[in-house]
A protein has these predicted regions:
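Conserved active-site "lid/cap" helical segment
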Residues: 4, 21-86, 90-91, 252-264
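Conserved catalytic cysteine-centered active-site region
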Residues: 8, 31-59, 88-96, 100-143, ...
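Conserved small-residue
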Residues: 14-16, 34, 62, 82, ...
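Active-site-proximal alpha-helical scaffold in enzymes
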Residues: 59-62, 68, 121, 128-162, ...
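Short beta-strand-to-turn element immediately C-terminal to the catalytic PLP-Schiff-base lysine
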Residues: 208-212, 280, 289, 350, ...
Length: 379
């Protein structure tokens, strides 16, 4: 007996976003006395009693995303899932007195932000937490997208948080030469600049509310954009350096476009991973040129020159910014770039500009060679 034919997968929409980060205008880049005067991009977030900072960032972003969605109460608890992750947890354990690791041990796991949100909301549907370094947040969205398309859910809260602005983690990134030595915002060179010399670390929480067509029919929410497709690959090249050719990252982008039914020529904007490291920026340029060609291409920018590199949260944060950019028709500028790398100069949006087109891409590339591409379309 043949297997039953699967129905056409439903379309998936983003109906709300929540962002807790340093200001998107770059004004939050400041010398940090806790980090020996280096620049950092700290977020402002109120803490609840006995709440780890990582949880607070995830909670605040989730509350933003859900603030205008009371109609979700009409969906059954098992029709809603939480896909909020972190690349690491418990960083405060390494910079102070040993915490109580008894019943509170779970709070220091990378999966704990999502667990805390599930418990608070009472959502019992599927949920996954997968730490994949700087691709964590983007991967969380992809997993939620897949489960929604399979009909396992009608709504999902997906995203990530990062709270790693601690002396130990800063020293670790400094030791591998990834951090900018700048101690004043005016000295910082942003992503894709000829003189870029590393990134500034930031922290953030970001959450996106995803709903299937069936979910939308029940909640009545207005979609911001449609999540058309996604893909992930791995370089299998090096633990901290990307493949200089960008072969697998380019494959992820091509696969995501193919799943979305979109040609490269239809992409109006790419929110690049763009960290400001020489090896990372050049590899990503190879990705973009490999997929979009050598002539006219999409507009490109990275927001890390404004908010810092938020590590595991970056994929979710940048996806949320991409969603807002597409919904509002405005491309965020690539802050801190004074002299653009020649191979990308003609595509780079140095300042905010209008977006002409209906499709945008968010790219994430994480340590370990993890690559994720997300493709969004106007709703």
């Amino acid at each position: 007996m043949p297997y039953p034919v699967a129905p056409m997968p439903p379309r998936i929409y983003i109906t709300a976003t929540g962002i807790v980060s340093a200001p998107l205008d770059g004004s939050g880049l400041k010398p940090d006395p806790l980090l020996n005067g280096r620049l950092s991009a700290r977020a402002t977030v109120p803490l609840m009693p006995d709440e780890p900072r990582l949880h607070a960032l995830a909670r605040a972003a989730s509350e933003q995303a859900l603030a205008g969605a009371p109609a979700l109460a009409g969906l059954a608890a098992d029709e809603k899932g939480v896909y909020v992750s972190a690349s690491k947890g418990g960083m405060e354990c390494f910079d102070g007195p040993p915490p109580d690791l008894g019943p509170g041990l779970w709070r220091y796991l990378s999966s704990s932000p999502g667990q805390a949100i599930r418990a608070r909301l009472g959502w019992t549907g599927p949920g996954r937490n997968t730490p994949l370094a700087c691709a964590t947040g983007a991967y969380s969205l992809g997993l939620a997208f897949e489960d929604l398309r399979l009909g396992r859910l009608k709504a999902a809260l997906a995203g990530a948080a990062e709270a790693s602005l601690t002396p130990l983690i800063v020293a670790a990134f400094d030791n591998i030469g990834a951090l900018s030595p700048a101690r004043a915002a005016g000295d910082l060179r942003g992503p894709f600049d000829e003189q870029a010399h590393g990134f500034v670390m930031g922290e953030a929480g970001a959450a996106l509310l995803l709903e299937s067509e069936d979910g939308l029919a029940m909640t009545g929410h207005q979609p911001l954009v449609e999540l058309l497709g996604w893909a992930c690959t791995c370089d299998a090249y090096h633990m901290t350096s990307p493949d200089p050719l960008g072969t697998q990252a380019a494959r992820a982008l091509r696969l995501a476009l193919a799943q979305s039914g979109v040609s490269p020529q239809e992409v109006a904007y790419v929110n690049a991973h763009g960290t400001g490291t020489r090896s990372g920026d050049k590899a990503e340029i190879n990705v973009l040129r490999g997929v979009f060609g050598e002539g006219a291409g999409p507009r490109v920018s990275s927001i890390k020159g404004a908010v810092g590199h938020t590590l595991g949260a970056s994929g979710a944060l940048e996806a949320a910014v991409t969603v807002r950019a597409l919904a509002e028709g405005r491309i965020p500028g690539n802050r801190g770039c004074v002299t653009p790398l020649a191979d990308l100069a003609d595509w780079l949006a140095l300042d905010e500009e209008a977006m002409a087109g209906r499709v945008a891409v968010s790219m994430s590339m994480g340590f370990g060679g993890h690559n994720v591409a997300l493709v969004f379309g106007k709703a």
